[in-house]
Every structure is written in C-alpha cells, then in structure tokens.
Regions:
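N-terminal, polar/Ser/Thr-rich
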Residues: 11-53, 526-532
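Hydrophobic alpha-helical and helix-loop surface patches within well-folded domains
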Residues: 36, 75, 259, 291-564, ...
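Ligand-binding face of N-terminal immunoglobulin V-set domains in extracellular IgSF glycoproteins
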Residues: 51-79, 84, 95
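Short, well-ordered beta-strand segments enriched in hydrophobic/aromatic residues
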Residues: 52-62, 228, 559-568
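Short aromatic-acidic-glycine turn motif
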Residues: 77-87, 236-239, 585-588
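Short acidic/polar inter-strand loop motif in beta-rich domains
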Residues: 80, 167-173, 620-631
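Extended, low-hydrophobicity, Ser/Thr/Pro/Gly-biased non-transmembrane segments
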Residues: 94-122, 128-132, 137-150, 160-275
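Beta-strand-rich binding/interaction modules
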Residues: 239-240, 526, 539-542, 546-621
Length: 666
C-alpha cells in the first residue's frame, strides 16, 4: 500500500515541524512581522527594448506616534543612469570590484522614471516629487526621492498609494540587469524607505532611513507581504522570491507568472530562456519542509545538485542553531558563464544567486559549496533578522560569514586545491593537487590587522571598497572569533542564538547585539565587544626573545638562567597565557596581565643544561583570531623567525588581501 508523505516520514524517523506558511506563501497563524510595507506589483518586460513597465500598489503603515506627511523612496536603478550618480562616482574613485557604471556606454545605462503616484481617492502626487541627497551634496544623484501628501498619515494609520513607472534595464552590473538574454532584477521597483521609531537602533524620534545607492552598500527595508505578477515572453523560465501561485498564457505570446510571499523585506526575480530547473524537497526532523529549486544553465545539472546539497546543509544548520527557516521555498539561481561576477553571490528573501562550475569536483566542489552556504546563511541575518546593511553591514556579512563557516566545519567540508586546477585538466591534475584544508583553518586566512576605522560604520564612510570588505567581512569575522574564544564555544553559540531568536523580523542594531552580549557573557564581554566592533583596537602578542646563559662558570651542570621576553604590541585587553617548555620536557604556563603592561620578562634559574627553556608560545590554545601576526606567537631558543617565517608572514598578509577581495564579492 502507498503511504501518505507525512506517514512515510514518520516511518523513516523524520518528523517535520508544522509549516509556517501554506503552499501559496501565505502565513498560517499570526504574522511573523509587523508588515509595515506591503506591495501588489505588476511588471511587463519587453526584452527587445530592454524596457520594464510597472505598477505598484503600496500599503504602508505609520508605526510612529508622529503624523507623517512626507514619504521617502528609493529609486535604485538610477544609480546606473549616468556617470554622475553617487554610486558611479564612488565606483570610479574607490575601486569597487563590480563593473564600473562610469564606463557604461549610452546603450548600457539603466534608469527608473516614475510616471504616476496616486492616492486611493485619485489625488496625484507626482508634482510633489523631489530628489533628495541625504548622504552627500551630489545634486545629480537620482536614487532617493520624496512625495508630499496633502494630509499626513496619522500615528499608526495606513496609506494606500499607487505608483506607476517605466524603467530601462541596465547592462548587468552589481546584481541587476541583463547579460546576453539573461535577466536578473533586484531593487527593480520604487521602494519606500524605513521609518525608524524609538527605541529602534537608538533613534530618539521617528526618523526616515533612506540612503542613496552607494557602491559599497547593500539594502534596508521594512517587512511586508508581496503579491507579484510578471509578464514575459513565453520562452523565458522565471524564478523569483516566494511561491509561484499562478501562470496565465496570454494571446500576445507572453505568460503572466504570479508569485506570493508574506513577511519578507524584498522581491527579486530572474528570467532566461536557457535555464534548466532542478527541484528537490528539504526534509529534516523537527524542521519545516522546504521546496528547493535550482535554476542553472542547461549544461550544468551537476552544479545544480551540489548547490541544492549545500543549501540543505545550511538550512539544517541554521534551523538547529538559530531558528527554523520558515518559508516554504528556496530558489537558487546560477548565472551563465560571463554573468557570474556581476550576478553571482547575492542574497534576497527565499532566493540567492550562486555559481556554476564546468565538471565540478565530486562529491563536494568547495567553490560551489562555499558561496552557496554563505548566501543561504544570509536568509537569517539579511532576510529575517534584517539589520541595516547601509549602516551596520557587519551584523549581516560578519555574522553570516562566521556562521556559514561554522556550518561548513560541522559538515566536515574541506577545501581542496584541486578546485583551482584548469577546467579541462581538473580530473587529470586533481589528484596531484589534492589537499584537505578545514573550514576552521581557511577562516584563519581572514585575519585582519588593526584598521583606522571601526567595523560598525556606514558603508560609504569607509575610505574605499577594499576597506569595506576588510572590515565588514575579515575584521568582523576575526572579532567574532575572538569574542567566541574568550566566552567559549558553548556560551558564544548561546549568545548568537539568543540574538537571532529575540530580534527575528525586528531590524536590530549593534546596540542590540551588545546588550545580548552583556546578558550572556557579562559586562566584561560587552566592554570587549564594544572595542571589537566600535573601536579599532588590535592585538599582536609575541615572544620577542629567549636568552639562556650561565651566571657563573660552573660548567654545563651548573645553574642556568633563561629570560623569556613577551611583548604586547596591541591595545586589545585580552588575557595572554604563555606556555614555556624546557629541555627536560617539563612545561608550565605563565600569564601576562590583560592591561597595564607592554612587555614582560619571565626569568628561570635551573641547574643543568636540561633545565634551559626550549620554546615559548603565547596563546597556546590557538592563535587569537584577530592576531595581526601569528607567526611571532612562538619562538624556540635555537631558532629565530628567519626567512621561512618571513615568507610565511608575507603569505599570510597576501591571503588577507585575497580574502578581503573575495569577501567584497559576497
């Protein structure tokens, strides 16, 4: 006899948790979020002209106690309008690794033009549109605008507004646009900003948070329900945020695809006539079922299977360590060859973009897995905890990089240098390059030295794109690892879980993370975290020298004196244990005070040559993740750092730069 799916799962010992949404993307039970900004969106794409016509019915609630007459909106695609936008200027000046808008030809450019803005009673607001520049004095920027209402929205009142717009799809850049018929459209509709209310993220009065499009920042938006209808040529396969709820064939050769999802902060979509669609169901005991869909180029099914494997690992890890992923679907998009650098490695609610590999290594190609797990991890920090990525990107990028690294380590994933062999020679040369580097060891390459800027800084205030990447990825991960080392893995895991559960769907800030740190780890842990994320403190504890000699001429069996000098070159107040090992095999551990000293000498007097100090090592339990130079952590009596250590140090520095550059792409 055939068993029903739910019965079969019980027989197999896999009992899923009850779903939070139905198969139409609608919440079952109480809303997960406040649903401040909800949209009914309709869009028609004309690929021949690269034109998009759209209509949005926005329902917005004034969460504050103050009437609101002026509404703030984003028009992100105007970043691609010309070389005068703030986005384009920052790209040209700061060296952003994405394709430069300043180098776009006229045919490459994209834009958004609002054609109508009407209230429910028909009142037209377009004449009140004003371009705003909250972050700089660039009067040529057109990425933020305001509309002024004839009557203010009362406290906790609701407004319905119809927006119509036309847009030109830009050449693919910074995760939006078109490349040889492949469309990926993020931030594609006029989107209302976030009205922050006390005590949210420390604001003292209701304040609009609606920043311009910047080259080194991502996004911030309120939660809401999205019901979206996309009309495109019949030949194109479509993937999007949420669940597909309808498909209508039209007489003009187009198809209207309808999607819905409650309680999300955004909606992104992709369309291409070259997609292969691969489906699977994620099932794990105690977690809700999730339908997984991979959209990959037709020749890359092997990549699709690995992308779905990696997504499933991340869904289970996040569900067990933070809180269960509640949505019914995940869509994984792998752009075609040539589009990955501009569209790959980006996260949206229920959807992310990954990568494909010709002939990926089996069973796990870490180039595929690492990006997929990182992007799937964003579902929690960017998508559901939903911190402000304009101003505090580390709360997403840093925590996600740390968390997805932990997930990879728990799954015993290993980096294999065979991944880097040329495509045509990978199978033949792979065995000669075979290596296994744990995720824990790989993360050590993301060390970051002391910087002139803190981690918790608005993205456009960093000196350049490289500094943004080093801080929000490298230094943030190293700082989290340092805090974890001080608190211990179990307590730090409890800190992260408490933060995730308490602030899911609530837009927390750095102050909220620090408050949970104090709650779980105590006042001392909060003080340390404050310096890690809001300061520029660094650490470079080192064994400076070991010197042994005889104070009297009594021969080798006479008394020996050994001095071990330990130097504290940083200003981060961490305990500094020192392990001392002697020639006779005995060991002892000393302590250098966390504060108040820059160096300390330990002196030992022992009889006989076997009593001499052989080796000394600071932090014997493992290097501090934020250590600027772990090469100098240990020294033996008979060796100095020498050329080998110097080369290792330079390699580590180069690895930091590579890790930061890669981080900026994720």
């Amino acid at each position: 006899m055939l068993l029903a799916p739910a019965v079969l799962l019980v027989v197999l010992g896999v009992t899923p948790a009850p779903p939070r949404f139905d198969d139409q993307g609608r919440a079952l039970g109480a809303p997960l979020s406040e649903r401040t900004a909800s949209y009914v969106l309709e869009a028609r794409l004309d690929p021949a002209a690269r034109r998009l016509e759209g209509r949005a019915l926005l329902t917005w609630t004034n969460r504050s106690e103050v009437p609101q007459r002026v509404l703030w909106f984003h028009a992100y695609w105007n970043a691609f309008r010309d070389a005068k936008s703030t986005f384009a200027r920052e790209q040209a000046w700061g060296g952003t690794p994405r394709e430069s808008v300043a180098g776009f030809r006229e045919a490459d450019r994209g834009w958004t033009e609002l054609t109508s803005a009407r209230l429910a009673d028909g009142t037209e607001l377009l004449s009140t549109l004003r371009w705003e520049h909250p972050d700089d004095a660039n009067a040529d920027d057109r990425t933020v605008f305001t509309l002024t209402l004839p009557t203010a929205v009362a406290p906790h009142g609701t407004l319905t507004l119809e927006l119509r717009w036309e847009a030109r799809v830009p050449r693919l850049a910074s995760r939006s646009g078109v490349f040889r018929g492949f469309y990926f459209l993020g931030q594609w509709f006029p989107k209302i900003g976030v009205l922050e209310v006390p005590p949210q993220r420390g604001v003292r009065s209701p304040t609009w948070n609606c920043h311009q499009a910047h080259a080194s920042t991502e996004y911030y938006a309120d939660f809401g329900n999205y019901d979206v209808t996309l009309t495109l040529p019949r030949s194109m396969t479509v993937g999007a945020t949420g669940v597909r709820t309808g498909r209508t064939e039209n007489a003009d050769g187009t198809v209207s695809h309808r999607f819905h999802q409650d309680d999300v902060i955004d909606f992104a979509w992709t369309a291409w006539d070259g997609f292969l669609e691969v489906e699977r169901t994620f099932r794990a005991a105690g977690l809700p079922e999730v339908q997984l869909v991979a959209l990959v180029p037709r020749s890359d099914r092997a990549s699709a299977e690995q992308l779905l494997d990696a997504t499933a690992v991340m869904l289970e890890y996040g569900g067990r360590h933070w809180f269960p992923y509640p949505y019914p679907q995940v869509t994984v998009v792998a752009p075609p060859v040539g589009a990955g650098a501009s569209a790959g490695g980006m996260e949206y609610p229920t959807l992310f973009t990954g990568d494909v590999r010709a002939h990926p290594l089996e069973p796990r190609d870490m180039v595929l897995w690492d990006v997929a797990m990182h992007e799937a991890g964003h579902f929690w920090w960017q998508g559901m905890v939903a911190s402000n990525e304009f101003e505090e990107a580390w709360l997403d990028e840093g925590i996600d990089t740390w968390g997805s690294g932990r997930a990879a380590e728990s799954a015993r994933l290993r980096w294999n240098l065979a991944n880097l062999a040329p495509v045509g020679l990978r199978a033949a040369l792979g065995p000669f390059f075979h290596s296994e580097i744990s995720e824990e060891d790989a993360r050590m390459l993301v060390r970051s030295t002391r910087f002139q800027t803190p981690v918790a800084l608005p993205g456009w205030q960093f000196p350049d794109a490289a500094s943004t990447g080093r801080s929000t990825y490298g230094r943030a991960v190293a700082s989290l690892g340092t805090l974890e080392q001080v608190l211990g893995e179990e307590r730090f895991a409890r800190l992260v879980r408490t933060y995730a559960e308490r602030f899911a769907f609530r837009h927390p800030g750095t102050d909220d993370f620090l408050a949970v740190t104090a709650e779980v780890g105590g006042a001392g842990a909060r003080s340390l975290a404050e310096r890690l994320f809001r300061g520029t403190a660094g650490i470079d504890d080192a064994v400076r020298s070991i010197h042994c000699g005889q104070e009297s001429g009594e021969g080798l069996d006479g008394p020996w004196r050994c001095d071990v000098d330990v130097e504290r070159r940083g200003d981060l107040p961490l305990p500094c244990p020192v392990a001392i090992r002697f020639d006779d095999g005995t060991e002892l551990t000393e302590q250098v005070p966390a504060e108040g000293v820059t160096w300390q000498r330990f002196t030992y007097r022992r009889a006989g040559a076997a009593g001499r100090v052989r080796e000394a090592r600071v932090h014997p339990g493992g290097p501090v993740p934020l250590d600027a130079d772990p090469v100098n952590d240990a020294r033996s009596r008979e060796a100095t750092p020498g050329p080998v250590a110097m080369v290792a140090g330079w390699f580590l520095h180069a690895a930091q730069l590579v890790a930061s550059a890669v981080g900026a792409l994720l």
